[in-house]
Amino acid sequence: MFVKTGDTVKVIAGKDRGTTGKVIKALPKVNKVVVEGVAIMKKHQKPNSENPSGAILEIEAPIHVSNVQVLDKNGVAGRVGYKVVDDKKVRFNKKSGEILD
């Protein structure tokens, strides 16, 4: 998967199109990522000893990795390519040519 935890990404499809955020969690087995401040959903939590009345929490839902593009340091969104530099495989932005790792 071309997206890693900590990458800054731009959402290119869906209700949050155009939003940028940091990847909190990458889920490679299901090809999804959790992006900070994107795809907010409400989760109803049952009452427990800490919160006797229960709560409605707002958490980020995972979105499909095809709906995001990685941003480089200059804020240019583009597809991710791989190349070998100094016997090390690195990711780079295909649009700007800048190395991401």
Swiss-Prot record:
GO BP annotations listed: translation
GO cellular component: ribonucleoprotein complex; ribosome
InterPro entries: KOW, Rib_uL2_dom2, Ribosomal_uL24, Ribosomal_uL24_CS, Ribosomal_uL24_KOW, Translation_prot_SH3-like_sf
UniProt KW Ribosomal protein keyword: yes
GO molecular function, one term: structural constituent of ribosome
Keywords in alphabetical order: Ribonucleoprotein, Ribosomal protein, RNA-binding, rRNA-binding
Pfam family for this entry, one: KOW
Assembly and interaction partners: Part of the 50S ribosomal subunit.
Known role: One of two assembly initiator proteins, it binds directly to the 5'-end of the 23S rRNA, where it nucleates assembly of the 50S subunit.
Stated family: Belongs to the universal ribosomal protein uL24 family.
UniProt xrefs under PANTHER family: MITOCHONDRIAL RIBOSOMAL PROTEIN L24
Protein name, entry field: Large ribosomal subunit protein uL24
Organism classification: Bacteria, Bacillati, Bacillota, Bacilli, Lactobacillales
